[in-house]
Amino acid sequence: MNSGGEEPTIKPNVFNITQLLNSNGEKPGIACIFLSKFDMKKGNIIIWSKSINGAAIDLSNIEFKSLPAGIHEQTDDVVNFVVPKELDVCQTAKTTTYDYGIAYFKQNSFDIIENDNRIDRSKVQMFSLGVIIDVQNASSDSKKHFYKEIYHAYAANRYSSYLESLLGQWIRQRDLDKFDIFEKFFDENNQGHMAENSVEVFEHSPKERRHLVEYLPYWTRKLGPLIFPLWKASLLQSRILILVPQGESFELCNSLAYCVFLISMLPKNLIGNHVSDEYIKPIFTVSTSDIPFLESFKKGNGYVATTSEEILLYKPEIYDIVVKLTSSSTIEESPEKEVEILTASGEQNKATPLDLEVYEKLILGELQEDASTNATCRHHEVTEPISWLQFLIDGFFLLTTAGYLVAPYHLANNFKIPRHVSGPEPNNSEIQIAENLVRYFHRRTSNLYNDLKDVIQKSENIDSEQPITIAASFLTKLNLDCFSKQDHQFVKDIALKWFQRSIDISNLPECLGNLC
């Protein structure tokens, strides 16, 4: 980890969701606008586009990004994506830059079926209207208030409601060979125009769509204790693929990618200015056409992306873990089916027993929910069984204290969720829950970083080539599971990533006295 002594240019004390939501009024200039279409004979095609003069934006395969496989099962949807800039031969994702894009999709096939009781292919219309933002040249006062990376990853979304309105107007005009409405919108809001007029706030703006961060409570409920191994993987900058199930909204699934990116961020006051290399990269919707781009991401410089193309899972060299979601009907109506997290080798990645305990005793309280019997069973299905050693120690405490005391390692869940009312919308509990959850994970990350840093600094006299040995009981201080091999490996990996130091963890029997 880069730990230069320079003072950070941006120093937010805590995550503030009001600043994030209010920034919706600030819209960066558009570098490119395009219209793609699904043609019954030709497939996905671009039928119109316009870019600012001198913009080196590669629109190759943009028709597949804006019309990903499976989107035809939605009446309308929003698709996030990135457009990589040209890769040099020796360039890696650590230096790769890309532009963020968004497209609004709309089709009429379901209306045709409802009206005619059959599908007339000659009448089917499937369009995606999209914009691309060159975030390298974007300017916003938001950068002064909170992480510019959060702003960049969401920059294109600030146009989603406008694209919805524009595409609807264009379809209603019935002359589908006229693009004047798009031309006018681009001329008023392109990067060159807005650079001269600062950040423009639109008059008579259409109603904003939900901010992607507002889906965090939803995903925390659906993932259950699996939110924790996903958070740990994001801190390690694993390459994470989220598999979009059949019939699911791309907007919903991309919100998970954004939320994973958001909760993984390291506070800038810990790591200084050199932060761009330390975040997992949200690249949103990808397909087989993006394989060369995905191959540029090496282990430890990861991404979080969504895909509806299961064929990508047959290329384990391009990802570390895959999150297999259930379809919306399954999520809502058949909760017995659980989300799965699998490694590239096909092994299931489960939550630790402590993750489960923290989720049920802490996170569910924040979500204002009680664990039902069915939910408890489902949570246990995605959790590792407790070790025999923990079983014996728990039994010892139960017998000798009549259940009055528990072993110290259970007290890790006393790590409280920071509560903070930051905005003028106290009635919107979901927004407040989202903020509290983000701040909880940021605080856990900060504590993990600081505690490991203290241990390493106290061992400075040890040869840097020699591993630093810590007791397994120390993981309790880190709010991790001292019995779990998974958490043992996580501590070793994160210490090596952040501090370039190797750590050994003592065998559990050696620390039994500390635990008892």
From Swiss-Prot:
Domain (cDENN) ranges: 211-365
UniProt keyword annotation of Lipid biosynthesis present: no
Entry GO CC: cytoplasm; endoplasmic reticulum; lipid droplet
Keyword Protease: no
Sequence ranges assigned to domain uDENN in this UniProt record: 31-185
Compartments (UniProt record): Lipid droplet
Keyword set, alphabetical order: Lipid droplet, Lipoprotein, Palmitate
Superkingdom: Eukaryota
Record note on modification: Palmitoylated by AKR1.
Lipidation (S-palmitoyl cysteine): C511, C516
Domain named dDENN: residues: 367-513
InterPro entries listed in its UniProt record: DUF4484, LCHN/Anr2, Lipid_Metab_Assoc_Protein, Tripartite_DENN
Additional record remark: Present with 2550 molecules/cell in log phase SD medium.
Function: May be involved in lipid metabolism.
Name by which UniProt lists this protein: Uncharacterized protein ANR2
Lineage: Eukaryota, Fungi, Dikarya, Ascomycota, Saccharomycotina
Encoding gene (name): ANR2
